[in-house]
UniProtKB/Swiss-Prot annotation:
Tissue-specificity statement: Expressed at intercalated disks in the heart (at protein level).
Residue ranges, annotated region (Disordered): 1-41, 1514-1568, 1715-1856, 1914-1941
Pfam families the UniProt entry points to: Xin (PF08043)
Polar residues bias (residue ranges): 1514-1565
Protein name: Xin actin-binding repeat-containing protein 1
Keywords: Actin-binding, Cell junction, Developmental protein, Repeat
PANTHER family in alphabetical order: XIN, XIN ACTIN-BINDING REPEAT-CONTAINING PROTEIN 1
UniProt-listed InterPro entries: Actin-binding_Xin_repeat (IPR012510), XIRP1/XIRP2 (IPR030072)
Main location: other
Biased composition (Pro residues): 1834-1843
Keyword Repeat assigned: yes
Gene: Xirp1
GO biological process, one term: actin filament organization
Length: 1941
């Protein structure tokens, strides 16, 4: 055993590798014990097995655990485990031996088994309890056994379930119930298994092990391989026939889909066990088989009732364990057997069943054919059974006659065609071998066919016991099989049915087709008419009407002339008569209807008089040239007519049981004269025999069973008897083919229909209600061709190919021509809502309109019946130059009209053409009149008179079966109005039906249209023609009765007729635009005004703009409005334009000046209006282009713009003061106004919405799709790594972040200040508030946002400042406000979220606070800045210190703010934050020193440039703000760092980096787009406009937020969405930063004066430039890798942010001052873009540089050049920014770089060491940024975004180390160390910083000098000097690299 186990271990390993069948038998053996324990099963009986069973279980458990072990660990444990297992198993030698033997004996089989069990979930191995449970709660679900078992056989994935089933089987096996196990495998729904044993993982332990004996294992294996599950165990496999007795069968053939429903009754008492172990007796079984060309499905339904007590011998109760389908492929017949796995009830109770009985499973049938291999009855393959069924039975169990238990139940399904129709017998009796074998098989069969099961079972012993079962050898399964297989069912009838039986037996028995004794076996049935012609019967339908005691039968034979008999192929049976046999068995009576047929050669007419004279009526309907005759044959049984009471008694009581009464009606041929034209022909009954008479009559006929019906229903209850019941059944004999449709309509009480009695018409016609569908074809003719024949709405006769029963509907046609000349404007009373399908076929344009249910539109047919119009198809027909229209109305009969329903009768169709410009629309009006307005009821029953004598089938309106020509008594009057207006002529046809007799006084004379009177009345330019169509009998055609009809028509009061006109627009859908009538437009006008007002009231509209509202599918209503006064929009212009709202929105989204954030105004059903912000546009997405708009935009479009009749949806495009386009989407209830859709990316809008719903982050708009995409990868990686917790955190964080970032980014993009405000608001307020704030912010007013904020708080500014201050003061508060971020955060999440949300939010809040403080300060400062830049510089120096500490302080007199922010930062950071803060402070000290130096320079520069560029100062402030934001972020990250110092450090760095990145991105954007430059300029302007400064600051904050997004970058690696978010955000940041610099300045100024939302305009311009530069820099972004794009965006953002900072710094720097002077003014100019571009382009080199020091130098030179200019203004922060960008781009995954950046920021004071590190890091960062942009490496950009997340997700030591190292580097740790720790990222960051620093002050502060130099260069470039500076910067960069190196 040890060895086997060993091998089993190996096998297990293998199993893990490939679950499929393990090759090693030993392993199999082991597994078998483990999973299935097949070894134990075979050897020991279940009882014995149990003791060992538990040991086995332990072994299994051990094995299960073993499987879960790591392969390495397993190696170590292998020997010990093997030994232990060997010991355990050896204790039970038999088992061990069995398993070993198993391996040896059935290696292949065992392997199969093992393979199956191996596939179980590892943890599902081995639980004793599970097994026990299974035993206790056994469920016997029904269902598709085959597919279920196939599932088990083929699926390895569902191992768990298998194991469960195995377990169950084991338990059962323990009971000796192997079959049960098999059943479980086959039939137990997987989910039920799962539920039952969801907690039991050790199911693997297959209880089978012990109970299964050696032979059984083989069976089990076979089961899985190829044999029916019953092969496994103790279940007897029984064929369906033996268990189930067919009660009834319904076959439907529709097209090529055949549906067969069989209702069975279980013969031996069968039961099913449910999960709880309760046993339910199966009352009936239904199998539904649907067979189409390729697919065949079967469903078993069991009807059960609880079996509380089993009165019968338990040995007779079979528990059905499973059902399996065995298909035996035969060349000609596909035989399928349903095999039931049954188990004697008593066997279940016995734990041990003689396993010998099941050992037959050892007969393993080898063979590749799975179906053959499948063991029948658990042990034998079907093919072995076929010849030797008895042997197999013997092998299995001695079959004792009558012993149901051992009976072989063989149920083979033959192709459905081969089953005789009489299988549909009313009640089938089960064959109980025990009792029934004594009976006559034939008799039994008959019973099956004709008796209800219940009656058979009760009466069997009495009635049928007499029959001799000698034919069937008792216990001989073979004979039974023969019985069921070969004997036609009808040949097994009761003795009483002998006549039938004999006749039916003429069909050769044994032939499978014998079962189809119906019309199929004798394919051709004919009826001979009096002419001697034969008519082939195509379908037979019988209708039985029971009204009270009277039964009437109506037989309708549909025939077609049989021109010649093809005797070679068919034998023609002439239907001579119909026999009704009433068979009574027990208390159940069944009637069988048989056709008496005579072969052609034996036709003699037995014309004897019948007491009854049912007649066969013939209807001939001419379809084309084929005459179809319908022969109607009605019976009225004598006894029901004359001896009702007696007969009733007889039927009830005196009819002897099993007595068969038969009545035969023989038809006689009718004299020729009896056949009248087209009337139905009645077959006259020559003689009606009763049974007794029949005996003596020499009728040589073959009887074919048409159908059986239970007679019990006639005696059921008196109440029922009073009702009129109608049974109708129909068999279609389709040219003798097997495929037929047999539809039975049973026992539908007529009272359920409107007219119970209407069903029985004397003439036998089908009543109107029974025809299901009418198509109303309105045939129209050109006006000039209007003839008598055209009745306007004409009913089209059924098409030739429509079969009688299929004639679904009437079709009415209405045609008009010269559409182009028919114009009229008629007020539509009602606009019919229709759905149009426009199709063009050649010259026929067809448009189908589906009518809605209310009101009902009806069309009257000739008989006056109303048909509900379900759809109208309009075809425009071009004939030459004449345009015609044809209306085809599809209808369904309108059986009953409820009072509450409005029914409009369509009288005519009117068309009017409308021309608007070059759009021509045709309007179709249906002239209707309410049904109730018909006078008196005359018109309500009009029958149109129309026998248009044309050969054309359409125009020759042949009466449908039930319509009689003679009944046409109505004239249709058409009134045509021709209205000529200019060149427009409209003709209106009014068709009215008047009873002819109302016109003539004689209804009989009307047979055809006689005249058309046209009355022209000209009034002015209106000419009215009245056409009167009158009908007269053909013979009276010449008598002109026109006047009468005219007179009649004229008086018809027009007022009485409510005319409802349905307006159908015929314009092609794509041109369906201005076709609405003016009235509608007015309505919409009102609606539009309401919409505008509503939107104004909810403050969604704050600027002038355009409101576009979805009008219909193809047009939109556009209203240009202007806000003359708040809340009072004035509509300047309104028009309907063709187009899709969605298309318009998408187009708008692609415009550059669209604000990313839009407002979503929704009105719920209660009328509450909810305003939320929606991120329409990712800034990054804007670059990405259309393909990225798909996801969120699509969702937004669908949700917002999907049409809803009750909802007004649309968008408002407002032009804000900043000239950006703001989109407001609205969805209002009909009374409410549409939302205005702010232009923007719908995706981003959606993202924004989502973001607003969650916390707003100043991150990029979350792209839903990107998020998801990213998440997929991230999740995949997480899953691969097994980091599920992270995944969860990530998920939450990423969602929040993405939302926040989406919002933040949107906000930033739209207006950083607003975003900040909204973010703050969001943080402070709840989501709705945030949404409001966002919406307001979006609305384009920072002020508005502030106002919202104020509303939520106190004063706008006060509240905002407060909140900001609050945020600054209490980062925790901010975090709290953020809430989710704070909670999520703790460590990793916090960082992520915080970086994304908290950091960003905190930073943004802090920034806002700073901004507000700065705003206040900047208001003063901006004054100071503007005026005393020196002050600014001083402040800036202070700020530098503050920035180093916390950039927050910068603008806040920078120092104060710094302190507060520092405090908040520290608070937020906590201890870790403090540590981070300390490092930050060190960095800050360095940074301050550097900053002081730089600021001194900058101050000089600023002083110099101050005049030149206050804006630059502002930008500097922005930069500082950014820095402060970064610092805040650092603090936030520090806070997050609380989780881990390393992480914190990295977070701080990341935050710094992200901030730096933001700065860099901004700078990059600025340089790329020159937007940063322009933004700087704008920012300067904004600074000048202190208000703007606040916005700039906000932008900085946003940058910070974006930086947070970069921080997120770390998360991004895992979460692509984060990645994407970050990248998107960063790109947005970049864009925004292009803008953002300006925006930052604007935000700063906005912070100062958040009211200055207008700065957004600047942001917008910058956005464009930024986007352009981003596009340039991030070429890949547009190229398509979203990730790459995101990365690039992020990189770009960081880069541009850094750049912005650098630029700002450059402005501050003296050199920068000059550059900034020119740059600030020329920020937009190419120089900055060049620098940025350079930096961005540098990325590749930078990347290389990052990767290698020398390359870094080179790229550094470039990238730093770019970065340094950007960074120069804020040397350290820019460096940081650069770093973050680089890191984001290159090492986004690594948070460390960002922390490094942060450290560099702090380090700024420490010049030399930090510069090196900074240079390295900064350079690498810049390189990264550049590289990211160039490379489009999503990961880098993302890092900035999710630093926190990243740290968390990356919480990887590396990030932390990197962060620490970065911090250390910042702290002057060895730069190389930092680089090493930070990896290239840090180096890049350091380098970037260093570059920037060195540029500024290479000697003093490397970082400063490089940055300064870079910035100066950048500015010089911008101004023209930038190039020189860049050159300088490049050199310094190399120096930096050298230093770094």
């Amino acid at each position: 055993m040890a060895e086997p186990q060993k091998s089993s271990k190996v096998a297990i390993k293998k199993m893990e590798d490939d679950l499929p069948p393990p090759p090693i038998p030993d392993s199999i053996q082991v597994i078998a014990p483990a999973s299935q324990d097949p070894n134990p099963l075979p050897v020991p009986p279940p009882k014995q097995a149990f003791s060992k069973f538990y040991q086995q279980r332990q072994v299994n458990e051990l094995k299960r655990l073993y499987r879960h072990m790591h392969p390495e660990l397993r190696k170590n444990l292998e020997e010990a485990v093997t030994e232990d297992l060997a010991e355990m198993l050896n204790t039970e030698d038999p088992n061990a031996q069995g398993s070993v033997n198993l391996d040896k004996v059935l290696p292949g089989e065992v392997q199969s088994m093992r393979w199956i069990f191996e596939n179980w979930a590892l943890d599902s191995i081995g639980d004793h309890q599970a097994t026990k449970k299974m035993m206790e709660d056994e469920i016997i679900p029904g269902g598709d056994v085959k597919s279920t078992s196939l599932r088990f056989e083929n699926q390895s994935v569902n191992g768990d379930y298998l194991s469960t089933t195995a377990k169950v089987s084991e338990t059962d096996l323990a009971r000796g119930d192997v079959h049960t196990a098999r059943w479980l495998f086959e039939t137990q729904p997987l989910d039920s298994l799962n539920k039952l044993y969801s907690d039991e993982t050790e199911m693997q332990e297959a209880v089978l092990k012990e109970p299964v004996q050696g032979g059984d294992v083989k069976g089990a294996k076979e089961l899985f391989e190829a044999q029916s599950l019953d092969a496994i165990g103790r279940c007897c496999s029984v064929e369906e026939k033996s268990i189930l007795q067919l009660k009834s069968e319904i076959q439907e053939l529709k097209g090529d889909v055949k549906k067969t429903i069989r209702l069975f009754q279980t013969e031996p008492l069968c039961a099913i066990r449910d999960k709880t172990g309760n046993i339910h007796e199966i009352k009936s079984v239904c199998r539904e088989e649907i067979q189409s060309n390729a697919v065949r499905t079967a469903r078993w339904l069991f009807e059960t009732q609880p079996l509380d007590t089993i009165n019968k011998d338990t040995s007779k109760v079979q528990i059905i364990r499973g059902i399996s389908l065995e298909e035996i492929g035969r060349p000609d017949v596909s035989g399928a057997r349903w095999i039931f796995e049954t188990q004697p009830l008593d066997a279940i109770r016995e734990i041990t069943v003689e396993e010998q009985d099941f050992k037959a499973s050892t007969d393993f049938v080898t063979g590749a054919d799975v179906t053959k291999q499948r063991l029948l009855f658990g042990t034998q393959a079907l093919d072995s059974l076929k010849g030797e069924a008895s042997e197999s039975v013997a092998a299995k169990e001695q079959v004792i006659g009558g012993d149901v238990k051992s009976t072989l139940w063989l149920f083979e399904t033959q192709p459905m065609e081969t089953l005789k129709d009489n299988v549909e017998v009313g009640h089938l009796k089960k064959v109980e071998l025990s009792a029934e074998e004594k009976g006559d098989v034939k008799q039994r069969k008959h019973v099956f066919e004709t008796c209800p099961l219940g009656s058979i079972s009760k009466a069997f012993e009495e009635e049928i016991s007499a029959a001799s079962t000698e034919e069937v050898v008792k216990g001989d399964v073979k004979s039974f099989k023969t019985l069921f297989e070969t004997l036609p069912l009808d040949s097994i009838k009761e003795v009483d049915a002998e006549p039938i039986t004999k006749e039916e037996e003429k069909i050769p028995p044994g032939n499978v087709k014998a079962n189809q004794i119906l019309f199929e076996t004798t394919p051709l049935y004919a009826i001979k008419d009096s002419f001697g012609n034969f008519h082939e019967v195509t379908s037979v339908s019988r209708e039985q009407v029971i009204s009270g005691d009277v039964k009437k039968y109506k037989w309708m034979f549909e025939t077609r002339p049989l021109d010649q008999f093809d005797e070679s192929t068919k034998k023609v049976d002439i239907i001579r008569g119909i026999t009704k046999q009433e068979v009574v068995a027990g208390d159940v009576r069944t009637a069988k209807w048989l056709f008496e047929t005579q072969p052609m050669d034996v036709i003699h007419h037995q014309a004897t008089q019948g007491e009854e004279h049912p007649s066969m009526k013939r209807e001939i309907s001419q379809r084309g040239d084929v005459k179809t005759c319908r022969w109607l044959f009605e019976t009225q049984p004598m006894h029901t007519l004359y001896e009702k009471a007696e007969k009733k008694q007889e039927e009830d009581v005196s009819v002897p049981q099993a007595d068969v009464k038969s009545y035969t009606w023989m038809f006689e041929t009718q004299p020729l004269d009896s056949l009248k034209g087209q009337e139905e022909q009645y077959l006259r009954v020559s003689k009606a025999y009763s049974q007794d008479e029949l005996q003596g009559v020499d009728v040589k006929t073959v009887r074919h069973l048409f159908e059986t019906e239970p007679l019990g229903s006639s005696v059921v209850s008196e109440a029922d008897q009073k009702k009129t019941l109608r049974y109708s059944s129909r068999v279609e004999i389709q040219s003798g083919e097997v495929s037929r449709v047999k539809e039975f309509f049973e026992a539908k009480p007529l009272d359920t229909t409107t007219k119970p009695t209407a069903v029985i018409k004397d003439d036998g016609t089908i009543e109107a209600g029974s025809v299901h569908k009418f198509t109303w074809l309105f045939e129209n003719y050109p006006m000039d061709t209007l003839k008598d024949s055209s009745e306007g709405i004409q009913e089209i006769p059924p098409e030739k190919d429509i079969k009688g029963g299929d004639v679904g509907g009437k079709r009415f046609i209405f045609e008009t021509y010269s559409l182009d000349q028919i114009h009229d404007k008629v007020d539509e009373t009602e606009l019919h809502k229709i759905q149009k399908d426009t199709m063009s076929k050649a010259n026929v344009k067809s448009c189908t309109m589906l009518f809605e249910s209310q009101p009902l539109y009806a069309i009257q047919d000739k008989e006056g019946g109303y048909h509900e119009v379900t759809s109208v198809q309009k075809e425009e027909i071009m004939k030459g130059d004449v345009k015609g229209a044809r209306w085809l109305f599809e209808t369904k009969p309108l059986d009953q009209i409820k009072k509450e329903e409005e029914v409009f009768v369509i009288r005519a169709v009117t068309q009017e053409d409308i021309k608007k410009g070059d759009v021509q629309a045709a309007r179709w009006r249906f002239e209707t009149e309410p049904l109730d307005s018909f006078p008196g009821g005359k018109i309500s029953v009009p029958r149109t008179v129309d026998d248009v004598q044309k050969g054309d089938v359409q125009s020759n309106k042949q009466l449908f079966e039930s319509q009689q020509v003679g009944q046409k008594k109505y004239v249709r009057m058409v009134s045509v109005s021709d209205v000529q207006r200019g060149d427009v002529r409209t003709s209106t046809w009014l068709f009215e039906n008047q009873p002819v007799d109302s016109l003539y006084g004689d209804a009989d004379r009307s047979s055809s249209i006689s005249t058309v009177q046209r009355e022209d009345s000209q009034k002015g330019d209106v000419k009215r023609c009245t056409w009167l169509f009158e009908t007269q009998p053909m013979d009276t055609l010449k008598d002109p009765e026109v006047t009468v009809s005219t007179g009649t028509q004229e008086p018809i009061p027009r007022a009485d007729v409510k005319s409802t006109t349905w307006l159908f627009e015929s314009t092609p859908l794509d041109k369906f635009s201005a076709s609405e009538c003016s009235r509608e437009t007015e309505l919409k006008e009102r609606t539009m005004r309401e919409t505008l007002e509503t939107l104004c009231t909810c403050q969604a509209i704050q600027h002038d703009g355009i409101l576009i509202e979805a009008n219909d599918t193809e047009s939109v209503k556009m209203v240009k409005y202007q806000l003359s006064s708040p809340g009072a929009p004035e509509i300047l212009k309104e028009e309907i334009v063709r187009g899709h709202l969605q298309g318009i929105m998408l187009q708008l989204l692609h415009r550059t000046n669209v604000e990313p954030q839009s407002v979503l105004v929704e009105e719920d059903r209660e009328g509450k209006i909810k305003v939320s912000s929606l991120q329409l546009l990712d800034q990054s997405e804007a670059i990405k282009g259309k393909e990225d708009l798909s996801g969120n935009v699509a969702k937004a479009l669908q949700s917002l713009l999907s049409q809803d009749a009750s909802i007004k949806k649309g968008m408002v495009i407002q032009e804000t003061k900043s000239e950006s386009v703001k989109m407001t989407l609205y969805s209002l209830l009909f009374h409410s106004v549409q939302q205005k859709v702010v232009k923007g990316d719908v995706k981003s809008t959606i993202g924004n919405l989502m973001a607003s719903s969650q916390e707003q982050r100043a991150t990029v708009t979350v792209k839903r799709e990107d998020n998801e995409k990213g998440n997929v990868q991230l999740f995949a990686s997480c899953i691969e790594k097994g980091d599920l917790d992270y995944l969860k955190n990530l998920q939450q964080e990423s969602e929040i972040q993405s939302l926040i970032s989406a919002q933040a980014e949107q906000g930033a993009a739209e207006s950083a200040p607003r975003a900040l405000q909204s973010t703050n608001t969001h943080v402070l307020a709840n989501k709705e508030q945030v949404e409001k704030v966002m919406a307001e912010a979006k609305s384009g007013a920072l002020e508005g946002a502030k106002m919202v904020f104020a509303c939520e708080s106190t004063g706008k500014e006060g509240a905002l400042e407060r909140e900001v201050v609050h945020a600054v003061g209490v980062t925790g508060t901010t975090v709290q406000c953020l809430g989710k971020p704070q909670n999520l955060p703790t460590g990793m999440e916090k960082e992520e979220i915080m970086s994304g949300g908290l950091k960003v939010t905190t930073k943004s809040i802090q920034r806002v606070a700073d901004v507000s403080k700065n705003t206040e300060k900047e208001e003063s400062i901006s004054a100071c800045l503007k005026e005393p830049k020196a002050t600014m510089q001083g402040i800036a120096q202070a700020k530098v210190t503050a920035e180093r500490n916390e950039v927050v302080g910068e603008q806040q007199s920078l120092v104060t703010e710094q302190a507060s922010q520092k405090q908040s930062e520290e608070k937020v950071l906590g201890n870790d934050l403090q540590a981070a803060m300390q490092s930050l402070r060190l960095a800050t000290a360095e940074a301050r020193n550097i900053q002081h130096h730089v600021q001194s320079k900058l101050q000089r520069n600023r002083e110099e440039v101050h005049m030149a560029c206050r804006q630059q100062v502002a930008s500097k402030q922005e930069t500082k703000t950014l820095q402060s934001t970064i610092h805040q972020q650092e603090s936030a990250s520090t806070m997050r760092e609380n989780t881990s110092t390393a992480i914190r450090t990295s977070t701080t760095r990341v935050q710094e980096a992200s901030r730096t990145h933001t700065s860099v991105s901004q700078k990059s954007i600025a340089s790329h787009k020159k937007v940063s430059a322009s933004e700087e300029v704008q920012g300067g302007q904004l600074l000048s406009q202190e208000n703007q400064v606040v916005p700039s600051r906000d932008v900085s904050i946003k940058d910070g937020l974006y930086t947070a997004t970069p921080v997120k970058t770390y998360i991004n690696p895992f979460v692509e969405s984060d990645y994407k978010e970050q990248s998107v955000q960063e790109e947005r940041d970049v864009i925004i930063r292009g803008d953002v610099q300006t925006a930052i300045r604007a935000l700063q100024s906005a912070a100062t004066e958040q009211r200055l939302v207008e700065k957004e305009d600047i942001v917008r311009g910058n956005l464009k430039a930024t986007l352009q530069s981003l596009e340039k820099s991030n070429v890949n972004v547009s190229k398509g890798d979203f990730k790459a794009a995101m990365i690039y965006r992020n990189a770009g953002q960081s880069y541009s942010v850094c750049k912005k900072k650098s630029e700002t710094q450059v402005n501050n720097n003296q050199t920068a001052v000059v550059a900034s002077g020119s740059q600030a003014d020329n920020d937009f100019p190419p120089p900055p873009p060049v620098a940025v571009m350079k930096a961005e382009h540098c990325p590749p080199s930078t990347k290389a540089t990052r990767e290698g020091a020398p390359p870094l130098l080179t790229s550094k030179d470039e990238a730093p050049g770019c970065f340094s200019p950007l960074q120069t203004p804020l040397p350290p922060p820019p460096s940081l920014s650069c770093k973050p960008s680089d890191q984001n781009s290159t090492e986004k995954p690594k948070i460390p770089p960002k922390p490094e950046i942060t450290a560099p920021l702090r380090k700024k004071p420490v010049p030399p060491p930090k510069p090196e590190h900074l240079l390295h890091e900064a350079y690498s960062a810049s390189t990264n940024n550049s590289t990211n942009r160039s490379t489009k490496s999503v990961p880098p950009p993302v890092p900035p975004k999710p630093p926190g997340l990243r740290e968390i997700s990356m919480p990887k030591p590396p990030p932390a180390e990197l962060q620490l190292s970065c911090t250390e580097v910042c702290e002057q740790s060895d730069h190389r160390e930092s680089q090493d720790k930070c990896c290239t990222l840090e180096s890049s960051m350091d380098k970037s910083i260093t570059v920037h620093g060195p540029e500024r002050k290479l000697p003093k502060y490397t970082a400063k000098t490089p940055l300064q130099m870079a910035e100066e260069r950048y500015k010089a470039r911008k101004g023209g000097q930038g190039k020189f500076e860049l050159d300088r910067a490049k050199p310094s960069k190399p120096v930096k690299n050298g230093e770094v190196g």
